[in-house]
Swiss-Prot record:
This is UPF0735 ACT domain-containing protein Helmi_18680. InterPro entries: ACT-like_dom_sf (IPR045865), ACT_dom (IPR002912), UPF0735_ACT_dom-cont (IPR008310). Coiled coil: none annotated. Belongs to the UPF0735 family. It comes from Heliobacterium modesticaldum (strain ATCC 51547 / Ice1). Signal peptide: none annotated. Residues 72-147 form the ACT domain.
Length: 150
């Protein structure tokens, strides 16, 4: 791939030098807020600061093209104790991260729920998650409403 004179490569992480991999880890730690200082992050991963600064702007995470990591899901739940809790536990068990959630007032025994999900670290695909949610007792429906544009 060529972008303004720069050349980019998609490379299997297994063949990258250790300094590049550790630089990617440091960038991730800083982005997630796990650490606040570069010196703290490089010490944790065992990388020199000079190596980090040499590679930091050249190491970017790969996002699968066409796959949106932020999705909106709509549910219709029966109004009984514990149903929403089971939904949240199911999402968490699959390593999904709920960013926002909204539950409306139940009408006729049913409560609409909508949540926005970061699925970047999920251990299963979205159709499997929706199928698992639909199988839960008290979940009348679960559907994808939308996703962020790539």
């Amino acid at each position: 791939m060529n972008d303004g004179g720069k050349r980019f490569y998609l490379v299997d992480g297994d063949i990258l030098p250790e300094a590049i991999l550790k630089t990617a880890l440091v960038n991730e730690m800083l982005a997630k807020g796990e650490v606040t200082k570069v010196s703290e992050a490089v010490e944790k991963v065992g990388l020199s600061r000079s190596a980090y600064y040499k590679y930091k702007d050249g190491v970017l995470p790969f996002r699968e093209p066409g796959r949106s990591n932020i999705v909106s899901v709509s549910l219709l739940l029966e109004h009984h104790p514990g149903i929403l809790s089971r939904v949240l536990n199911t999402v968490a068990a699959m390593e999904g991260n709920i960013l926002t959630i909204n539950q409306s007032v139940p009408e006729k025994g049913l409560a609409p729920v909508a949540f926005v999900l970061d699925r970047s670290r999920m251990s299963v695909d979205l159709p499997r998650l929706l199928a698992e949610l639909r199988q839960l007792t008290g979940v009348r429906s679960a559907q994808l409403v939308g996703s962020e544009e790539e």
